[in-house]
């Protein structure tokens, strides 16, 4: 993919992060988002694992039949990236691709602990900041990201 295309994707992700913010986020919100993601994946015939955490506490976790422990490892690795940067894991993936420097080299991080690949999106409270994250694993990185974005947009538009 060309650098200009990657730059456009990067800008779009920043817009998502800026606009897809919550006024509050409860355990019930986590449940509704998680169920929406699972039902959407089922309807579309996709096998995923999903995790929603707030303030370091897991509020929702579900692994569809056909997913494995490897999906859980990917979730944790993506979550560490969001926790470190307060940006989506897809944004960090694209920024690494633009720079041409692998994420792990740039930040001197262990690749077995951190995964800058799409699928983990920060839960941000307006005028507060990042308080958690929504993570999907099982699909290509951009599709994992898109599934989370669809769920957040749907939830915020209710």
From Swiss-Prot:
Coiled coil: none annotated. It comes from the Bacteria. InterPro entries: PduO/GlcC-like, PduO/GlcC-like_sf, YBR137W-like. Belongs to the UPF0303 family. NCBIfam families: PRK02487.1-1 (NF002692), PRK02487.1-5 (NF002696). This is UPF0303 protein BcerKBAB4_3106. It comes from Bacillus mycoides (strain KBAB4) (Bacillus weihenstephanensis). The lineage of its organism: Bacteria, Bacillati, Bacillota, Bacilli, Bacillales.
